[in-house]
């Protein structure tokens, strides 16, 4: 199969692009070639496309849409929706993502849900960093926008950790909360990030209304126990032993995303929403291949 990856920057480590790198690495073993052949078998577009028409079937990988009422979300969504309507098939990252999109764009008649995957071959080749100073290492990593709730991550750590535990925070943080057991390491390359995860017992991701964060899949694959919010799709891939902080259900109405409500940590439970243990990228890439190939052959 000759497949064109569209709207993917293989030199970027952002969430969608890092997943594109994994597909680019794993799908050739299935007989997939990626090039700019003018007559491909299919296009796989990440999120949205700038093309008005296609000379082969288009499949859309949709990792989220806009719903922040403080912005013109309808305009932000317009080209994503156009791509959605052009697509022969749609791949959603999570059940939450599918329900959100159906609510805003209407149902699609050909779709599947494939959760994100981790590069286990790479993870298994990396040694964990030795952090002997602490009995238990906690970690978190993100692009720290307001809805990622860094301050709540820190509050959870301070209220639930032992006195000999430490929290390592990766990513660019503007307003640092200073504490002797909290350490900021900035943006890390993927090898160092995985090394940190492998040294960590817990990974905190209390982001509000996240879809299917790659950092959580990677941290879980590295052996971390996940702590996350019930709001959004993260709970679907956080593992059966994850701790879930329950929030009010959301009716999909536009909201002020960057003003997340405070969390009540008393409302926490084990993960009863977990639906996926198959996060090996080898298996995930086969799901992508089979969805597209079966549809083309059908």
Where are these regions (language model features)?
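Active-site proximal beta-strand in glycosyltransferases
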Residues: 42-70
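Short alpha-helical donor nucleotide-sugar binding micro-motif in glycosyltransferases
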Residues: 84, 195-200
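Conserved donor-binding/catalytic core segment of Leloir-type glycosyltransferases
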Residues: 129-148, 154-159, 167
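Nucleotide-activated donor-binding/catalytic signature segment of Leloir-type glycosyltransferases, i.e.
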Residues: 171-194
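Aromatic "clamp/platform" in nucleotide-sugar-dependent glycosyltransferases that forms part
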Residues: 208
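Short hydrophobic beta-strand element within catalytic cores of glycosyltransferases
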Residues: 225-228, 235
């Amino acid at each position: 199969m000759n497949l064109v990856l569209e709207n993917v920057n293989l030199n970027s480590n952002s969430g969608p692009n890092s997943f594109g790198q994994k597909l680019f690495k794993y799908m050739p073993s299935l007989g997939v070639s990626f090039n700019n052949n003018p007559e491909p078998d299919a296009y796989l577009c990440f999120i949205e496309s700038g093309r008005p028409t296609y000379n082969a079937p288009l499949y859309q990988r949709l990792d989220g849409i806009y719903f922040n009422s403080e912005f013109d979300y309808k305009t932000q969504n317009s080209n994503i929706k156009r791509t959605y309507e052009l697509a022969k098939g749609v791949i959603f990252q999570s059940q939450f993502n599918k329900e959100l999109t159906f609510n805003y764009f209407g149902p699609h008649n050909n779709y599947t849900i494939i959760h994100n995957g981790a590069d286990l071959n790479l993870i298994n080749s990396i040694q964990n960093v030795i952090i002997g100073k602490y009995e238990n290492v906690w970690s978190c990593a993100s692009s720290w926008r307001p809805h990622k709730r860094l301050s709540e991550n820190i509050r959870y750590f301070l209220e639930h950790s032992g006195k000999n535990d430490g929290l390592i925070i990766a990513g660019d943080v503007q307003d640092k909360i200073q504490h002797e057991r909290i350490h900021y390491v900035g943006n890390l390359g993927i090898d160092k990030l995985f090394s940190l995860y492998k040294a960590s017992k817990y990974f905190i991701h209390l982001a509000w209304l996240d879809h299917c964060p790659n950092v959580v899949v990677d941290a879980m694959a590295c052996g971390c126990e996940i702590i996350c919010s019930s709001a959004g799709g993260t709970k679907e891939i956080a593992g059966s032993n994850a701790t879930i902080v329950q929030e009010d259900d959301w009716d999909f109405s536009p909201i002020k995303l960057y003003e997340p409500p405070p969390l009540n940590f008393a409302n926490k439970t084990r993960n009863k929403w977990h639906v996926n243990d198959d996060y090996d990228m080898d298996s995930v890439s086969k799901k992508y291949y089979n969805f597209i190939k079966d549809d083309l052959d059908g």
